[in-house]
Amino acid sequence: MIRRPPRSTQSRSSAASDVYKRQREKELLIDSESFCMLPWMHLHAYPDGRAYPCCFAFDPYPVGDLNKQSLKEVFNGDKMKEMRVRMLNNQKSRGCMKCYDQEKSGFFSLRLSSNKHFGHNVPLVHNTLPDGEADFVMKYWDIRFSNLCNMACRSCGTWFSSNWYEDHKKLTGSPPPHAKVMKVGRSTNDMWEQMLESFEHTEQFYFAGGEPIIMEEHYRILKELDRRKMYHVRLIYNTNFMRTTFKDIDVFELWNKFDSVSIGASLDAEGDRAELMRKGTVWKDIVANRKRMIEVCPKVDFYISSTVGLVNSLHVTDFHKSWTEQGLIKPADFNFNLLQHPIWQRMDILLSLIHISEPTRL
């Protein structure tokens, strides 16, 4: 007969285990130089199906292909499992080098931000198997359903804008190595059906594109969240802000139903400059959309997500000042994203081209 240990012994053992788990969680979230919460609760996908652990992962190192594999297969594929094992052992992964480089320069990286905002999910780590397999739980979604877009921004290309297709043919003499409009998934409803299986766990959606405001899938998600009354789910957008309606739907009315909505408008300049930099922009419509948004959904967070490069580096601060003075944004509602590609539009080549007589304008 096997005797059970005294209850007090069991309690002490359980308490010790809990203390160890809490200490381990602190080590991972605060002390580790490689751990990131995202590989335990998230996947990112390009419109062509390439899957990554997040949107900031290094392009040459995808972890799967959602046009051939399911979300579950990618989530617990060899590359994701290896990444988790490395993170748990405080070893860095080559696909995460962008975050490591930012941290070396003193920036608050996506890795650090994810550990801060999703750190409450760290108990998921305790179920990780020795080979890195983890429970398939999708808390944060960032699937770029399509490259469908109503614009052709100078700093973009065919992978993220269907409107770039004809320009690419004119510039190169041949079509891109993919369809004009790409859609992620193994079939028409494949991604949607997989999402529904994990919908109940969702904490956050990030919508980008292409242009999410003109994508059918975007509204399908919002309507499903509305049907389930999941208004606590955080919605984050990156949009060119040219459109605020789709068919008979006013997106402002949908946003008003949710507790937390944050709109990052991709605007790099104003007036004629804006229309030059982002082909398809009608500036008066951008201004009208912002004014209507302030009136219709004033509680929705709005900020400008500006890509700063060679073309706008000397006047982007003028744009910020103008919109602040007009009351269209608050001074802090302006993010500067340094352009990395294409390299001939990078801001740092200015130093080899001109003598800066007014360095404060940078």
Residue ranges of predicted features:
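Recognition helices and adjacent regulatory flanks at domain boundaries
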Residues: 105-140, 149-151, 172
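Single conserved hydrophobic/aromatic residue that forms the stacking wall/gate
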Residues: 1-20, 354-362
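Core AdoMet radical
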Residues: 138-148, 157-187, 199-217, 228-247, ...
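Short pre-active-site segment immediately N-terminal to redox-active cysteine/selenocysteine motifs
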Residues: 95, 103, 148-152, 157-160
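Short microdomains enriched in Cys/His and/or Lys/Arg
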Residues: 74, 116-131, 169-191
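Accessory C-terminal segments flanking Radical SAM cores
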Residues: 22-117, 137, 340-353, 357
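Catalytic cores of alpha/beta
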Residues: 311-324
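Processing junctions and N-termini across compartments
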Residues: 10, 30, 89-93, 143, ...
